[in-house]
Amino acid sequence: MNHPTMPLGTVKLFRDAVYYSIERSPLLLSAKLVLTGQGSVLKALKGARSRPTSPLDLRYWSTTPYRWGDKDVVKYGLMPTSQHRSTLPATLADDYLSQAMQAHLDRHDASFDFGVQLRKGTMPVEDAAVRWDETESPFVTVARLHIPRQTFRTPERDALGETLSFSPGHAKPAHTPLGGINRARVA
């Protein structure tokens, strides 16, 4: 995600949001959150909305924790390191993000630093809405992701993209996804 936390960071909050969106009204969910002292969730949801210039310009966070070897727990992050930055077009087409990525990769490579943030102290595993303090545990770069210049907007690549899937459960035991949100995702 391009936000450091998952505003609906517990399975219960996520379930409630889906339930109220389908069976009731999103306004009732908003009222419930405010009346139960969870108004900060609404603020986080509003703050997560943005109009990014390009997926290649964004910072990304796993938002949920993962095992890191036998003893450690981490969150993952991708930090853009490309020199080129896109600008927001005056008119946003439905596929403006794809257009921006293609414009970038027509002329420039893209790159990201891949980092891990080690869990320290009481940093929670079960609530993905809580941001782990980066001053207490800064991200440590462990790799660089390099995306060379290329044309990816082709019918063949679009067809391939429709067949791809991702599950955090497809991980080696040393990198098992942790926390309730991840347990629900791999169930």
Where do the model's predicted regions map?
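Active-site-adjacent core segments of small-molecule enzymes
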Residues: 1-187
